[in-house]
Amino acid sequence: MIIPRSEHPNPQFERENWVNLNGEWEFELDRGVSGRDRKFYEREHLDSKIIVPFCPESILSGIGNTDYLNCVWYLKRVKIKKCNKRVILHFGAVDYESYIYVNHKEVYHNIGGYVGFEVDITNYVEVGKENTITVCAIDGHPNGKASGKQSENYYSIECCYTRTTGIWQTVWLEYVEKNYVKSVRYYTSIEQKSVQIEVEAQLRYSILRF
């Protein structure tokens, strides 16, 4: 199967050891937002399929359901290769509130549908074996949330496009050293003919900025 959006989502930080997780995931609607109570995160299978990173409202996802989707679930099995490195799971964006599970254990909770986030899952995976990644995405009516990806009306009035729920940007794995660079920012000055570089490094037990 051809992987959609196969390019690295952050080419400035493309490392040799990365795996694009776009493509087919298992998927299930949770209209009553009761899946966490019913422990969907312990399931080995969900009831349908979806093509990530396209949201379930999109035809490209294979679903194309434009009704109100208060909660959706995703499941993907990933084999973690044997290596003496840390394993970082990246999400380009998940709209709006998300719970991330690895091998049926909650590892991260994120609120906000516009900015990417990452999770160090090293201590939750079994190397050399198949591991389960499960995502619960909750996205009810706006109720004070930033407008843009949702509308209180079925036909998306005051919203420039169809509602967007759940994963809508690339998901990928990265294998990194115990100490690694997380991000770099550049500040340029034409007047001073200078460039300042701000580096954020993840050390084994702390984050260093310089």
Predicted regions and their residues:
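Short beta-strand segments of immunoglobulin-like
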Residues: 184-190
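Accessory beta-strand-rich segments of carbohydrate-active enzymes
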Residues: 7-12, 26-32, 64-181, 206
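N-terminal pre-domain segments of enzymes
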Residues: 1-18
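Short, solvent-exposed loop/turn elements at domain surfaces
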Residues: 28-38, 58-61
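Mature N-terminal segment immediately following signal peptide/propeptide cleavage
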Residues: 16-28
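Beta-strand-rich binding/interaction modules
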Residues: 102, 193-210
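Short Gly/aromatic-enriched secondary-structure transition segments
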Residues: 36-48
